[in-house]
């Protein structure tokens, strides 16, 4: 897919990886809906982007992705404003083992809800023109982390859901591709608060283990993750792909054995 002229919706767009995604898409000529629960950060993000790009290229919408009605209204507002939707990036996420229900709701349930809403608007069988959905997972979605079992569960869920939904979208000839990104530790606000008691909960006594993991894996910068996003969007051959991004290998892909039964499109 050529990004120029397309309309993208990015959740968690006000800061960190989401903001890097938005800027990368704008640089490629897309129009971007900046979706975030943080009103102040969202307004500041749009103002900063307006200095680099034409103001009409972006739209900020405050939304709590865990609220299903707000999420539905957000998709409707984006399509009403820009007239279409071509690219969806389900990026919003938290890392909270103490309030683990919130972690599952934001990290996994909202990604599933967002994906289905995106398919409703983009699928060819619904009158759409096709498109692409990128779901943000993590290396924690491919490996266990003793101090973050619920976070791991949410990110593993994204990988399994994305791979399966990609097969389903192909089976239905929807014209929509789905891929996921699994980066290591990234220099964001989430990383800065990862070892706080309010996030680690019962695992707080093992915070030094997290620090050791960060030292071992290193820290990535958001623009590199944005490069991965653009690759997944522009390469039409990628569907159900799980992209890994690490300090040691950069951008690469998770290898999977072929499934014994592969559903075929009608």
From Swiss-Prot:
A molecular function GO annotation: NAD binding
UniProt-listed InterPro entries: NAD(P)-bd_dom_sf (IPR036291), Sc_DH/Rdtase_CS (IPR020904), SDR_fam (IPR002347)
Keyword presence, Lipid metabolism: yes
GO biological-process terms attached to the record: ductus arteriosus closure; female pregnancy; negative regulation of cell cycle; ovulation; parturition; prostaglandin metabolic process; regulation of prostaglandin catabolic process; thrombin-activated receptor signaling pathway
What PROSITE patterns does UniProt report for this protein, alphabetically?
A: ADH_SHORT
Q: Which SUPFAM superfamilies is this protein grouped with?
A: NAD(P)-binding Rossmann-fold domains
Residue positions binding substrate: 138, 148
Q: List the disulfide bonds.
A: none
Q: Which Pfam families match?
A: adh_short (PF00106)
Reaction(s) this enzyme catalyzes, per UniProt: prostaglandin E2 + NAD(+) = 15-oxoprostaglandin E2 + NADH + H(+); (15S)-hydroxy-(5Z,8Z,11Z,13E)-eicosatetraenoate + NAD(+) = 15-oxo-(5Z,8Z,11Z,13E)-eicosatetraenoate + NADH + H(+); (11R)-hydroxy-(5Z,8Z,12E,14Z)-eicosatetraenoate + NAD(+) = 11-oxo-(5Z,8Z,12E,14Z)-eicosatetraenoate + NADH + H(+); lipoxin A4 + NAD(+) = 15-oxo-(5S,6R)-dihydroxy-(7E,9E,11Z,13E)-eicosatetraenoate + NADH + H(+)
- Provide the alphabetized UniProt keywords: Cytoplasm, Fatty acid metabolism, Lipid metabolism, NAD, Oxidoreductase, Prostaglandin metabolism, Tumor suppressor
Give binding positions for NAD(+). 12-20, 36-37, 63-65, 91, 151-155, 186-188
What are the subcellular locations of this protein? Answer: Cytoplasm
Enzyme Commission number(s) of this protein: 1.1.1.141, 1.1.1.-, 1.1.1.232
EC class name: oxidoreductase
Does this entry carry the keyword Endoplasmic reticulum? no
Instruction: Tell me the active site.
Output: 151 (proton acceptor)
Gene Ontology CC terms: basolateral plasma membrane; cytoplasm; cytosol; nucleoplasm
Query: What superkingdom does the record give?
Result: Eukaryota
Per UniProt, subunit arrangement is: Homodimer.
The record's similarity note reads:
Belongs to the short-chain dehydrogenases/reductases (SDR) family.
| Record function comment | Catalyzes the NAD-dependent dehydrogenation (oxidation) of a broad array of hydroxylated polyunsaturated fatty acids (mainly eicosanoids and docosanoids, including prostaglandins, lipoxins and resolvins), yielding their corresponding keto (oxo) metabolites. Decreases the levels of the pro-proliferative prostaglandins such as prostaglandin E2 (whose activity is increased in cancer because of an increase in the expression of cyclooxygenase 2) and generates oxo-fatty acid products that can profoundly influence cell function by abrogating pro-inflammatory cytokine expression.
Protein known as: 15-hydroxyprostaglandin dehydrogenase [NAD(+)]
Q: What is the lineage of its organism?
A: Eukaryota, Metazoa, Chordata, Craniata, Vertebrata
């Amino acid at each position: 897919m050529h990004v120029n002229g397309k309309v993208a919706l990015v959740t968690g767009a006000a800061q960190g990886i989401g903001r890097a995604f938005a800027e990368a898409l704008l640089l490629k000529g897309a129009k971007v809906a900046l979706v975030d629960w943080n009103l102040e950060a969202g307004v500041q993000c749009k103002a900063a982007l307006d200095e680099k790009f034409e103001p009409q290229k972006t739209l900020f919408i405050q939304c709590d992705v865990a609220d299903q009605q707000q999420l539905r209204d957000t998709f409707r507002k984006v399509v009403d404003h820009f007239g279409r939707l071509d690219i969806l990036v389900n990026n919003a996420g938290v890392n909270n083992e103490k309030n683990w229900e919130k972690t599952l709701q934001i990290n996994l349930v909202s990604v599933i809800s967002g994906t289905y809403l995106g398919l409703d608007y983009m699928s060819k069988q619904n009158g759409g023109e096709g498109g692409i959905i990128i779901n943000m997972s993590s290396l924690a979605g491919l490996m266990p982390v003793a101090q973050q079992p619920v976070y791991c569960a949410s990110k593993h869920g994204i990988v399994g859901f994305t791979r399966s939904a990609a097969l389903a979208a192909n089976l239905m000839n929807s014209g929509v591709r789905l891929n996921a990104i699994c980066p290591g530790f990234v220099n964001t606000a989430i990383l800065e608060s990862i070892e706080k008691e309010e996030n680690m909960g019962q695992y707080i006594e093992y915070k030094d283990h997290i620090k050791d993991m960060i030292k071992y894996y290193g820290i990535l910068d958001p623009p590199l993750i944005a490069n991965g996003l653009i690759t997944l969007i522009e390469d039409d051959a990628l569907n159900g792909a799980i992209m890994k991004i690490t300090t040691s290998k950069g951008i690469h892909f998770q290898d999977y054995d072929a499934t014994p039964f592969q559903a075929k499109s009608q």
